[in-house]
Amino acid sequence: MSEKTFLVEIGTEELPPKALRSLAESFAANFTAELDNAGLAHGNVEWFAAPRRLALKVANLAESQPDREVEKRGPAIAQAFDAEGKPSKAAEGWARGCGITVDQAERLKTDKGEWLLYRAHVKGESTEALVPNMVATSLAKLPIPKLMRWGASDVHFVRPVHTVTLLLGDKVIPATILGIQSDRVIRGHRFMGEPEFTIDNADQYPQILLERGKVIADYEARKAKIKADAEEAARKIGGNADLSESLLEEVASLVEWPVVLTAKFEEKFLAVPAEALVYTMKGDQKYFPVYDNAGKLLPNFIFVANIESKDPTQIISGNEKVVRPRLADAEFFFNTDRKKRLEDHLPRLQTVLFQQQLGTLRDKTDRIQALAGWIAGQIGADVNHATRAGLLSKCDLMTNMVFEFTDTQGVMGMHYARHDGEAEDVAVALNEQYQPRFAGDDLPSNPVACALAIADKMDTLAGIFGIGQHPKGDKDPFALRRAALGVLRIIVEKNLALDLQTLTEEAVRLYGDKLTNANVVDDVIDFMLGRFRAWYQDEGYTVDTIQAVLARRPTRPADFDARMKAVSHFRTLEEASALAAANKRVSNILAKATEPLNDIVHASVLKEAAEIELARHLVVLRDKLQPYFADGRYQEALIELAALRAPVDEFFENVMVNAKEKDIRINRLTLLSKLRELFLQVADISLLQ
């Protein structure tokens, strides 16, 4: 069967830059699935994406499906014919469905009976006939939240479409996709190269587009060029470019022919906190800031043009003129804001609603202030500093700088607090109260910041759950999942002695009578334990290990983490599977027991050597392990408990638990309950698979 290279390119208006990669990757995944479902043999599927195009190139695509033999079994002979040998209605209906008459059917004999059988040789459809619908289906499945319609057409897509190129080798596959007739025409760069040209063979892509159209269609190559050129440009001025992955991706999605240039701004703007300058450079202008080797911002920035200019100084000058007013605004806001102390903004917080039922930002500030102080007392942080940080925590939201540059919240609070002469740990806490903002983000660096960050998040969790507005599906407008995971990460990774039970109760208490959900404390804790499940799964822990610990519902996160590590280690022990099975057996036996058990195991009632030996081991271990459990040394405890494998095996091999004599039976059940209680001090080992 012959094979050829296949190309599809959809030429569009400028595609959303933040969605470009996902659109291309989804297009490739969807089309690959279509090929596989159709049984079309193919090689590597490459995707290409630039601001005005999405393309796929498939190597070694078969020109048709393979022929195949089809067998359709019909009714059993007994049901296919009546007593006179005439075909039944069921047989005739089946035959019509196969396109034959009953007498043309074969018969299939097996040891279970005889049936009518239809065999046919089905010729595979041509790729040319199959591909148009496959492309259309793949495009229809793209993750596009909002579709556009253009002109008088009823066609909908993410952006208006101008060209559709469909080539199998050197042949155009005729089709109408997204309202456009397929052709071999490709559009180049808007201002460089050939605006439009034809491609003779799919193998020429993307090289022909690079050479004639001045477009780098390979997304990764374009991104790599920007990164390399920006690093070199920064090196030439003695600095290091801030090439964050998200901005690199966005810039690579904005240009077809990247040209990296270096510009500068006035040094006087460096008196403004670097975060505000960086915010406007990266967020508004898509520029890359440059730092010196000590991490200090330089009065330069790197940007990416989409054209090779004969006079790049004009482009540089233009960008410098664009950014200057934004930096001047930041300078003005910074100087204006510093004329007031942070706490002078407290009254204005009363004018901003946090949530309709939960009050204003001033109300939230009062709760955070109290809760941060309470948490500080629990973890050994400075209570006065934590309380002060809580009071000032939202004041920077009322400043000119944060109003204009919203992403500078927190960090500007830190700078203004330093200007006001606040304690350093208070100032740092104002910046770090929102950490961690995302997976892998840094945690608050000092105890006061930890107290404030936990207080802020717990206040939100208690309040929103308290009015019954917990997250549903993908909707989480108050970012409660992120808040819960943030609290857990801080407590676990900083090893803080906090209990979710008392922490949540205190957060709820501070709301007074505003909350309507009577089960708010349990709901918040259950939600946070659910976040634990997701966290540990991402860390690579097995589901049954997580369930074994969750079954005990430990509410101290640091303690939960210690149990997880202990059970995970226990699973590696030779005795683990046997003891897990034994615990499961004990659990089932105790679940079926209906008689009240004794408080203790009575040694005088023990008869068999195996039960006497098991009881002896339990007494020794119970006394030995109490300090382990008290100190949270769960891994050591489980290693000690692993020694029970032999006496437990002996017990089940030689002892009849449900003895006829009531006192012996109850004593043995009590012995098993004491065994189970020891393991349950750590986790429910019976849940391990």
From Swiss-Prot:
Catalysis performed (reactions): tRNA(Gly) + glycine + ATP = glycyl-tRNA(Gly) + AMP + diphosphate
Location, primary (coarse class): cytoplasm
GO molecular function, one term: arginine-tRNA ligase activity
Broad EC category: ligase
Example of a GO cellular component annotation carried by this entry: cytosol
Subcellular location: Cytoplasm
Enzyme Commission code(s) on record: 6.1.1.14
Subunit text: Tetramer of two alpha and two beta subunits.
Protein family according to the UniProt entry: Belongs to the class-II aminoacyl-tRNA synthetase family.
NCBIfam families, A to Z: glyS
Protein name: Glycine--tRNA ligase beta subunit
Organism whose genome encodes this protein: Salmonella paratyphi C (strain RKS4594)
